[in-house]
Structure formats: structure tokens, C-alpha cells
Amino acid sequence: PLHSSAASDVYKRQNQYRGVNHPRKSLDSRFASSNLPLRGAKGWNYEGGVRVPLIVHWPGRTKPNSKSHALVTGTDYYPTLLEMTGLPALPEQHVDGVSFLPALRGKAHDRGAIYWHFPHYSNHGYQSPGGAIRLGKYKLLEYYEKGSVQLFDLEKDLGEQHDLSASKPDITAKLLKMLHDWRREVD
């Protein structure tokens, strides 16, 4: 159910709220926080809940108006700042992060897999406990209670509309194993 708010009233009146199984294809321009074409929103494992733009301003070091599609996560900031300032890496303090300084310099940056673990229900009531892994162009989501998975090719399907888990069982199994191994490692 929708929470009582002015925004949800507008959603209801315009019949644009369709839930996780029927994501919106368009949204009235009054919704400035729309993250279309991404699926989901804050508190979801879908890209609409985990994808955030990163803007870096480093005069004399980064090229103005440049873009990178490098995949980074919050744990990557610390090792990146250490490398930017020339300070020594302290692996015991940042075992999860990878410096993305190469990406800031316009070079290739492959940081490996990124993991998410949400062992709780979301505040909106649609996201059940689960986890996810992103490796390259693929992202796998696992829902713990049902034991179900979804696999998406984010290069071809950024909106996460086409589940490939049945048609790509090898990739699904590989990513699911990596996700389970990671969860055991950090538990």
C-alpha cells in the first residue's frame, strides 16, 4: 500500500503507480525525482535504488565535462583519496574498496564485483529480504525467502525488465555462487 502523502495522492489520481511487477514507463514532469528508465526506487535492489551519479571536480587533474562509466561504490572512496593524496594504502583499513583513480584519469578501471545485502523488509513494503551482485554488465538479484533469482544484462536492459536467469543458467549460477561466497566471507 502507498503511504499517505501528497505525492501518493497524485500517483493514485493519475493511476501511474503500478508497483514492482508493473514499473512505470512514464511519469508526469512534476515528479522531479523520477529515475526513469531505471526500475525501483530508494530501498530497492534494482538500479533505481542503488545507482547514483558521482561527480568529481579536481582542477588540473580531471578533464572538465568528461564522463566515465566506471563502476564504483562507497567503499572505493577511501583508497581513492589515499592514492590521490599520495598517502600509503592501508589494506587493513579498507579491505573492500578499490581506488578508482585510473577512471578519473580516463583509463580503464575494472573494480570487480559489487555486492548488496538487504536482510530486512524495505520501508515501502515491496522489497523482501535479498541481495545482489553486479559484475561487469550483469546483475543478479536473489530474494532470500522465495529462493528466487533474477539476472539482467544492464548494457542491453538498464530498466531491468527482462530476466535472463532461465536463459543464461551458467552466468546465473556463477554470480549466485559469488554472492553466497561473499556473504559467508563477510558474515
Give short role names for the model-derived ranges.
Residues D157:
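Intrinsically disordered, low-complexity polar regions and short flexible loop motifs
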Residues E160-D163:
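Carboxylate-dense, calcium-coordinating segments in secreted/extracellular and ER-lumen proteins
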Residues V20-V50, R61-A70, T75-L154, E185-V186:
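C-terminal cap/loop subdomain of S1 sulfatases and analogous C-terminal strand-loop tails that border
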Residues P1-Q14:
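Single conserved hydrophobic/aromatic residue that forms the stacking wall/gate
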Residues L54-V56:
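Short glycine- and hydrophobic/aromatic-rich loop-to-beta-strand nucleating segment
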Residues L154, K168-T172:
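C-terminal structured subdomain/cap of oxidoreductase catalytic cores
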Residues K174-D187:
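Charge-dense polyanion-binding interfaces
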Residues K12-H22:
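Short glycine/threonine-rich loop-to-helix capping motif typified by GTGT followed
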